[in-house]
Each structure stands twice: as C-alpha cells, then as structure tokens.
C-alpha cells in the first residue's frame, strides 16, 4: 500500500488516485532567465524519480511541469542583455531541456509556458473579481486573502500573523493600494518598456501564482492528484494557488501536496544562494561531473530530506554506482559459459528482494531503503556469478531485475566498454590504493570489473601486470 507524506495534513496518507490506475501530477518548473541550478535539478530529479516509481508500479502518469517565461527576473535579465523576454525564454528553455536530458529526466507529458495561456489567465482573474475574491486598483488586480477562510492552512500559518508580517515587509506604495497587506497580485499593470498584454484592467502581465493555477487546471482538471515542488514554494506560492483555484471552482484543488528538501553546499551545510556566492548551475557542474553520478547522488536521498552537495558525497555516489555496474558486468561475463536453465532458489531470493524494495519505496518513496535493496540484489548477483556452474536464465533474470530497479532512479547500465591502456592502469592504481587502505572489497571489485571486460590481473613481486584474456 503506497503512502505519501501530505504537506497539507503533515502526515503520511495512503495514496488513492482520483481515477484508478492513473496519476495526474503537476510540478512547478523553473523561471527561465538563467541556467537551472542544482536546487532546480534536485526538484526535477526527485519528482522524476517519483514519477518513474509510479510507472514501475503500473500507473499511467500524466506529468505537467511549467515554464515561468514572464516575470520580474525575466524582464530585468532581458533588459540587461538587450534582448526580448521571449528570446531569453527560448534560450534557457532549450538549455533546460539539454541539462535535464543529460540527467536522464523524462520529458514532461506537457511543458506549458505561461505566455501561452494569457487569455485563460485573464478569464480566471475576471471570474475571481466577479466572485468578489479579487479587486482591481490602477491597472493591478489583487486577491482578497482574508476572504478565503483556509488561507495559510498549507503552511500552517495564522492569517493575523501573516498580515502583521506582510505589513512590515511590503513597500509603502503597494501597501497603500491594497485593502490588506497580505493580499497578493493576480495581474500587474505594465510599466514603461515592459512586455505586456491587453486586459480589461489595462495593459499588463500575470502574477506568478495565477500562472500555475491556470496551467495546472487546464491540463489536469479542477481537482488533481499530486502537486509538487520545493519546500520554499509552500508559502506563499502554493498557498496562493490553493486560494485562487478553490475560490474559482469551489472544489478541492489538490489531494496530495509533496515538497522536496533544500540543497546545501559544502561541509558547512550552507543553503545555496546567489548572495552567499555558492550558486552552482547544472550547466557548469556537468563540465566536470558525470551526469549519471550527479543523478545517482541526487536521486538516492529521500525527497523530503536536504541534500548536502560536497565532493566527498559525489565521490561516494560514483563508487556506489561503479559497484552496481561491476556486478552487472560480472553477470554478463558469466553468460558466456552459463548452462541453459534456471536456479529456482536464487530466483526466489531475487523476488524477495524486489518485494522488500517495493515495501521500502511504498513508504513515501524511501529511496535510501530502496537503494539498499538494489545493492543487496547486486551482491546476490556477484555471489551467484562466482559459482562454478551458473544458469543463463537466472543470470538474465537477476541482471534484468537489477536494471529495472535501478531505472526507477534514472540510471542506465553502460554496455561493457573497451578499455584503453590508460584507463586500465588507472584502475590498477586505484586497486593498489584500495589494498593499501585495506579496502579489500573495492580491490576485489576492480579485479572483477576488469575481468568482466577481458582483462586479467597478475600480482607479482614487481607489481601488478595485466593481460588480455585469450
């Protein structure tokens, strides 16, 4: 029974989709004024892993993730570069697709742009005005937060406290136009030189929150299963989406709210931010880090937990991924001399590991326990491959199962590659270092990795030599 942690109720709940066998989910995408940073990647990878697990369990998933392609950041960056907002958006949407493809993130079913839905946004805002949930002021339109009785519920915040905080942080000019400091913009009147669209309230552009309400309900309906995003979006963004959408439809907007944790940088666990100078883009990281390593590192931490981005943690992820690859290669190597047939006992052990894996992942996508079962299966495969007599059917079964479980994390096994002399020597040097540090497990893994690719090591008093298998 699959359970998810619902931010709205602050507890794990049994997942029951609106339509049996179908999951409709919306995840807030990036504002496309720059390359995505690792915080954006963390969210994209976390929810891609969740999506993949739903698909592994047999669900049909409709996955919608938007591009915010008009807002203050977009306008400021476009003006700085002397280009149009659409030109800026096109450039970084293309960059987003390139980065996410490198990380093996499945394309969304739909990737809507806010600017593709301006007419719907205007109609949505007008409906809120007609229902007295919104009011126009000098070309802007604001939402009456106090009129929505559940405002603040998602973040478990009190409206009175929010009003006090908003009055302290809102600029005087904007506060003077609002009925209440906590009211928020649905439509922003155009300033000179800004991109804008005509509306009943004058030329302007949509507010950030209304964009997601319109796009999510357009593609998934007035009520859908899952809404996801980073925990920094709980308030005000997701709370405002709820207020807008439920005021318009009178229906529950979303059944399950899922939020991923932050990324911290370095050994000091600093939260990533531009002001601290530790802002890191995926575009830059992938110049020096293998995409599969970054993907594996980020997808094997439970989505609600923070991730500590350090070189040491990346190195650990790389080693763990190499161990899994080595096990996969070892079994592939033994297929050459395997006998026809199956080993029912070993295959039953494999099925039990899969059952345990599902139990782990059904518990709010507990990837730490899930990946532990993947490693357990790899060990089973390694041990079986060392037997004098092995059966091809069983080797194939374990290898395919290992591949299937790991694919949930967005990882693909590499085909056995031809090693050049430099790579062989690098692995021999790594094996020597492992033996000196008494890491005999890693030493043996390297020997088996090379053996699986036809390279035989011979330890002599003069050092380690290698030869190609005849």
Swiss-Prot record:
Family: Belongs to the class-I aminoacyl-tRNA synthetase family.
SMART domains: DALR_2
Gene Ontology biological process terms, A to Z: cysteinyl-tRNA aminoacylation
GO cellular component, one term: cytosol
Organism (species): Levilactobacillus brevis (strain ATCC 367 / BCRC 12310 / CIP 105137 / JCM 1170 / LMG 11437 / NCIMB 947 / NCTC 947) (Lactobacillus brevis)
Top-tier EC class: ligase
Protein name: Cysteine--tRNA ligase
Essential cofactor(s): Zn(2+)
A GO molecular function held by the record: cysteine-tRNA ligase activity
Catalytic reaction list: tRNA(Cys) + L-cysteine + ATP = L-cysteinyl-tRNA(Cys) + AMP + diphosphate
Keyword terms of this UniProt record: Aminoacyl-tRNA synthetase, ATP-binding, Cytoplasm, Ligase, Metal-binding, Nucleotide-binding, Protein biosynthesis, Zinc
Binding positions (ATP): 274
Motif ('HIGH' region): 30-40
Cofactor remark: Binds 1 zinc ion per subunit.
4Fe-4S listed as a keyword: no
Signal peptide: none
Keyword Translocase: no
């Amino acid at each position: 029974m699959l359970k998810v942690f619902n931010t709205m109720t602050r507890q794990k709940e049994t997942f029951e989709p609106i339509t049996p066998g179908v999951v409709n989910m919306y995840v807030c995408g990036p504002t496309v004024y720059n390359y995505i940073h690792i915080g954006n990647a963390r969210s994209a990878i976390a929810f891609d892993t969740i999506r993949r697990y739903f698909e592994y369990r047999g669900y049909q998933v409709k996955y919608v993730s938007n591009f915010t392609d008009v807002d203050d950041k977009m306008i400021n960056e476009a003006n700085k570069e002397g280009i149009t907002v659409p030109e800026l958006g096109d450039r970084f949407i293309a960059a987003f697709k390139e980065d996410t493809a490198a990380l093996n993130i499945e394309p969304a079913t739909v990737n809507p742009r806010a600017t593709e839905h301006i007419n719907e946004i205007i109609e949505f805002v007008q409906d809120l005005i007609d229902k007295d949930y919104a009011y126009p002021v000098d070309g802007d339109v604001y939402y009456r937060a106090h009129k929505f009785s559940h405002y603040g519920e998602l973040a478990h915040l009190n409206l009175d406290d929010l009003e006090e905080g908003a009055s302290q942080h809102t600029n005087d000019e904007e506060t003077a136009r609002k009925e209440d400091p906590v009211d928020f913009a649905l439509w922003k009147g155009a300033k000179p030189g800004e991109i804008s669209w005509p509306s009943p309230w004058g030329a302007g552009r949509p507010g950030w929150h209304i964009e997601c309400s319109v796009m999510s309900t357009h593609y998934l309906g007035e009520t859908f299963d899952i809404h996801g995003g980073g925990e920094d979006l709980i308030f005000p963004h997701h709370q405002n989406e709820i207020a807008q959408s439920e005021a318009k439809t009178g229906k529950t907007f979303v059944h399950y709210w899922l939020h991923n944790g932050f990324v911290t940088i370095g050994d000091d666990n600093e939260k990533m931010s531009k002001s601290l100078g530790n802002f890191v883009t995926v575009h830059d990281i992938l110049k020096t880090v293998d995409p599969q390593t970054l993907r594996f590192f980020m997808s094997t931490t439970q989505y609600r937990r923070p991730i500590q981005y350090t070189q040491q943690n990346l190195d650990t992820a790389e080693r763990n991924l190499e161990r899994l690859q080595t096990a996969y290669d070892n079994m592939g190597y033994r297929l050459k001399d395997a006998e026809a047939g199956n080993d029912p006992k070993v295959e039953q052990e494999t099925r039990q590991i899969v059952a345990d894996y599902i139990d782990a992942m059904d518990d709010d996508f507990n990837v730490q326990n899930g990946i532990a079962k993947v490693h357990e299966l790899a060990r089973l495969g390694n041990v079986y491959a060392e037997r004098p007599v092995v059966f091809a059917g069983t080797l194939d079964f374990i290898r395919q199962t290992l591949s299937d479980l790991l694919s949930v994390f967005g990882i693909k096994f590499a085909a056995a590659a031809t090693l050049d002399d430099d790579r062989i020597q690098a692995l021999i040097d790594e094996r020597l270092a492992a033996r000196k540090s008494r890491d005999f497990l890693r030493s043996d893994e390297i020997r088996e990795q090379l053996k699986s690719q036809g390279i035989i090591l011979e330890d002599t008093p003069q050092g380690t030599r290698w030869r190609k298998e005849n």
